[in-house]
Amino acid sequence: MSIMVNRKTTAGGLVAAALLFSSTALAQLTEKPPLHGNHWMAVTGKPLAAEAGAQIFQKGGNAIDAACAMLGAVCTMWDVLSWGGETQALIYNPKTGKVIAIDALGYAPTGATPAFFKAKGYNFPPEYGPLAAVTPGTPGGLCYMLAEYGTMSLKEVLAPAMEMARGYAIEAQTANSFEAGKRRLKEWPYSKAIFLPHLGQKREAPEAGEVFVQKDLLETLTKMVEAEQDALKHKKTRKEAIYAAMDRFYK
């Protein structure tokens, strides 16, 4: 980029022109560039989750296998994208030229009626806590995508997430989020036990880089994988076995 400056421009005008050039050039330098890959690409908001997708690609998995692995990993390590939430996905099929939409939204529990909430003193469902939650949609969405459009087993794609649940070095962003929200986390025993391992200390959440363990989540994922593997032992197809894992979670 070049800037034409009139010889009669004042010193102030030159400074303004220079500042304009600097800010514009900086914006161009810091703008996220297009990314390209020869064979595949794995992109998420968390580097470790992107690595999970890369591992699946390197093992011969397709884009859906990698996406499911990244989804599992992100839900394990990002507090605002958890296994208890919901998932939406768009899948482009190059063979048909069509886009498939996956809307894995959770159902409201059958007991979540207006009468139920009014009996507890609420005019509306609360904004936070167990009574605000729907049935988790993410586990079902992941299993459906993998069963219908993937090629690998649930055991393979959940391996990175399960490894993280055993313990990984937590990032500053997530750890600080726990600390900032600790007043609300203390309202629920299980949340307090998992996310605030240093109760009573000045900082009750994990420190950045501390090994963060989620043993209950690991147990849940293990039960799903065990259901899949048991179905495979009984001569079920890959797809049937994944749906058996989904049933293990919901039923």
Language-model region placement:
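Bacterial N-terminal signal peptides that target proteins for export
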Residues: 2-14
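Exposed boundary/loop context
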Residues: 5-6, 18, 130
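Low-complexity, intrinsically disordered segments with a bias for serine/threonine
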Residues: 6, 26-27
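Hydrophobic helical h-region of N-terminal Sec-dependent signal peptides
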Residues: 14-20
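N-terminal signal peptide c-region/cleavage motif recognized by signal peptidases
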Residues: 22-24
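Noncatalytic scaffold domains of N-terminal-nucleophile
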Residues: 28-51, 55, 62-251
